[in-house]
Design a protein with these regions (language model features):
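Classical eukaryotic N-terminal signal peptides for Sec-dependent ER targeting/secretion
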Residues: 1-4
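N-terminal pro-sequences and low-complexity stem/linker regions of secreted or lumenal proteins
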Residues: 34-39, 52, 63, 108, ...
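Boundary/entry segment of secreted carbohydrate-active catalytic domains
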Residues: 15-39, 186-196
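Active-site-proximal helices and loops of the catalytic beta/alpha 8
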Residues: 7-11, 16-30, 44-51, 55, ...
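Short glycine-centered, acidic/aromatic-flanked micro-motifs in structured strand/loop junctions
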Residues: 34-36, 88-90, 222
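Aromatic- and acidic-residue-enriched carbohydrate-binding clefts of CAZyme catalytic domains
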Residues: 26-29, 66-103, 140-193
Length: 271
């Protein structure tokens, strides 16, 4: 059973209606995932194509600063899912380019949904300056076991779950051990403790920065590896959506979760 948790992307004054109304302009209800596109190209796509064909939103790749490491003389997609900081410096572009994309897409009625990576940071053993290892921005980092130092966001070893589980999730844990699924490392990725108030502050602060820019919603990566109570505490700190982004007349609060449970190949989401 695969469980995926996504921010509800809905605005409504009634919680039981939160799963029916996507924050899009002009009743558009289709989302396109422009995976690994550059911000400048997404902005142009909103203006030249998406607005004319009924698309309501674009889901973009994680915009935060990330690991930079080649594999087979190429840059693999998974480096985007190993954050270094919450600075808006990624292989998709700069902070200014991200802001410009959000503004231009919103202007033509296409909303932006951000893929947020908050379960973890880089893989254990990754350190900037080691052979072939860098970051997409200017932040230093040291993911060595027991060091776990990410000054670009302020995290150190005290902000990770090593004290709960000092190792990886095992395959069998997914059948019978929620504690290990949520507290141990996912394929070696340094697992953040979302129960720590400093971690909650940094994650919610970054999400609020994106809301201020004009983002309309979030996909939360690796949600099943985080405790629901911790996620609720983080998302409970979020601001209202900007009034020019929300289409609600009396409440533009971003609702918490939408849950999908599937037992077959994932083919689509219905919002």
């Amino acid at each position: 059973l695969l469980v995926i948790l996504v921010a509800a992307l809905a605005v409504t004054s009634h919680a039981d209606e939160a799963y029916d109304e996507l924050v899009t302009a002009n009743n558009r209800d289709s989302i396109v995932h422009l995976f690994e596109w550059r911000w400048t190209d997404i902005a142009k796509e909103c203006e030249d194509f998406l607005q004319y064909y009924g698309y309501g939103a674009v889901q973009v790749s994680p915009p935060m600063e990330h690991l930079y490491r080649e594999q087979n003389n190429d840059l693999p997609w998974w480096i985007r899912y190993q954050p270094v900081s919450y600075k808006l410096q990624s292989r998709s572009g700069s902070e200014n380019e991200f802001v410009d994309m959000v503004n231009r897409c919103n202007k033509v009625g296409v909303r932006i949904i951000v893929d947020g990576v908050f379960n973890h940071m880089t893989g254990v053993g990754q350190r900037k300056g080691d052979s072939g290892i860098g970051s997409s921005g200017d932040s230093d980092f040291n993911g060595y076991d027991g060091v776990e130092y990410f000054p670009g966001v302020g995290y150190n070893k005290d902000h990770f779950n090593d004290w709960r589980c000092h190792g990886d999730i095992n395959g069998g844990d997914y059948q019978n051990n929620a504690e290990r699924v949520k507290n141990c490392r996912l394929v070696g990725l340094l697992d953040l403790n979302q129960g720590h108030d400093f971690v909650r502050e940094k994650i919610s602060g970054f999400m609020n920065q994106l809301i201020d820019i004009g983002v309309a919603g979030f996909r939360l990566d690796a949600s099943k590896h985080m405790w629901p109570g911790d996620l609720a505490a983080i998302l409970g700190r979020l601001k209202n959506l900007r009034s020019d982004v929300s289409n609600a007349s009396n409440n533009n609060r971003l609702e918490l979760f939408k849950t999908y449970k599937i037992s077959e190949l994932l083919r689509k989401f219905s919002f």
